[in-house]
A protein has these predicted regions:
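Phosphate-binding loop and its immediate beta->loop->alpha context
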Residues: 1-166, 170-172, 176-178, 183-184
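Hydrophobic, small-residue-rich alpha-helical packing segments that form membrane-like cores
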Residues: 184-204
Length: 204
């Protein structure tokens, strides 16, 4: 879907579903249809949040910009939204190949220059959720501008498109210290999006 209007900044952890995994495995590639970002945003996240049962508050947050100052690790840990394949039990704790590129508090390892360790548990701070939100938006934008339908309607359809800029609307009275944190989150999101785009993910 392409949204032409503003949408909610809700963030929900959810496994990307592309149909029956068994069909992909038969091709010899268990991860042929893997989406590397662990979160959904906007209307999709709102639908997921509305259907949450039994794990409220553990699968995502609304308006992560409000929590830019909160760098504390999440004590209970984050869980994927939704139900397991049996339709009864809740989805497991957040995990996946993406955790090799962030710390347990959700900091992008590329921002720390070798001073951090890959996450073992998903205890990401609420501040880091802004990084995950921007990462998902960046990857969705790159995916859309490179979609066959989009490229075929423009000149040089065979040339891959590059995302040059993203414009965010923020309050003019935003404190300088908060602007600095937001800028760090944006830089981390860019590095994560690039890492996700060029890495080959295993079955994770």
């Amino acid at each position: 879907h392409i949204y032409a209007r503003p949408f909610e900044s809700r963030v929900e952890f959810a496994v990307g579903s592309f149909g029956r995994d068994a069909i992909s495995r038969r091709s010899g590639r268990a991860n042929a249809f893997r989406w590397p970002s662990p979160v959904r945003v906007g209307p999709e996240a709102m639908r997921l949040a509305a259907a949450t049962q039994g794990n409220e508050g553990a699968t995502g947050i609304s308006s992560p910009k409000r929590y830019l100052w909160d760098r504390r690790p999440n004590v209970q840990g984050w869980r994927f939204n939704g139900r397991a394949s049996d339709g009864v039990t809740t989805e497991p704790p957040v995990s996946g190949p993406f955790m090799a590129h962030v710390t347990e508090t959700g900091e992008a390892l590329r921002m720390l220059r070798g001073r951090g360790q890959p996450a073992v548990r998903a205890r990401f701070s609420r501040s880091s959720m802004f990084t995950f939100l921007l990462t998902e938006l960046l990857m969705q934008a790159v995916s859309q501008i490179n979609a066959p339908a989009t490229r075929s309607a423009r000149r040089f359809a065979d040339v891959p498109r590059r995302l040059r800029r993203v414009i965010l609307t923020l309050p003019p009275a935003m404190p300088l210290a908060e602007q600095k944190i937001l800028r760090e989150r944006a830089e981390g999101a860019i590095k994560l999006a690039r890492k996700y785009s060029f890495d080959k993910y295993g079955p994770g």
